[in-house]
Amino acid sequence: VDSDGRVDELVPVMMRHGVNAYLPFEVQAGSDIEEFRRLYPRLGIIGGLDKNALADEAPPAAMHRELDRAARLLEHGGYIPGCDHLIPPNVPWKKWCDFLGQLRRLTGA
């Protein structure tokens, strides 16, 4: 299910009715994919990495925190890494390509 905003109250209801994966888990709405993984270990999680960590004004450590988060979820399985929504125009192309390259290394793609 693609659901914008905060979905923590919807997930258990939707799972009871057969939904087994969600995206994009918006960080700005308070969604924390590591918390969702802890609460719902069988839920497929897609996205959930903070797109603003890639913004031109964001420090490099912000992107590395998101990559570390992706690595932790990938270890568990049931996770497709990606950003928490469309990539905004303040994300430089070079930074985006670097981020994607590092995600590829994490996933073995």
Predicted regions and their residues:
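Active-site loop segments of alpha/beta catalytic cores
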Residues: 1-109
